[in-house]
Amino acid sequence: MNTTVDEGEALAEALRDVDTESVDVLVAPPFTHIDRVARALEGTEVFLGAQNVSEDTYGAHTGEIAAEMLADLSVDYVIVGHSECRGRGEEDATVAKKAVRALEVGLLPIICFGESEEVYGSAERVDFLKKQVKASPTDMKDLDKITLAYEPIWAIGTGKTADATDADEVIGSVRASLDPAIRGKVRILYGGSVKSSNVAGFVAKENIDGVLVGGASLKADEFKAIVREATHG
């Protein structure tokens, strides 16, 4: 939960000239900011996302946001299974349901997966991550619309960053566990204390298709620098 509506709109306005020629650029503001941010980005190639969605359809689900509501606001992508949501008890099955709901209304889900520091240091690390991904709706026909995002929980908002080579190897193992028919269709991102000074090292790796940026995206100049470094190194 960051920025007021006015601040979010100003940030979006500052991103109107961000370089989108070689990379896909997405912003995912809080629900309350989406309409104003969408207007600020109108006419640009910047995609609009949301930070979460309900696994339910319309009905008596007070406080929830239905996928249809996001589609009405011209949202393109929606993040599901973020580590902060999983930390509040969200389970793999719920994440999968949210991804399916998003796809049903034409939204593109970004499905997050990641491990705690305890799991990171154990022999079960890769199997744990594969289990999370296996719960995703990877048997559906429109797999090219699904993006996965590896975000080690111990690197989210802590200033700690995974080693790029290690992240690449882990993502490569997860990709290899997918059905051969879909491996090349699914984009897998890295997220975890990404900034302009380290992004080039991640996107240069074979198995990392992009990055999911957190706190560094709250400053327009830094966000633009991340895009620039990801594009040109």
Descriptions of predicted regions:
Residues 1-233:
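Active-site loop-to-helix "anion-binding N-cap" substructures in soluble metabolic enzymes
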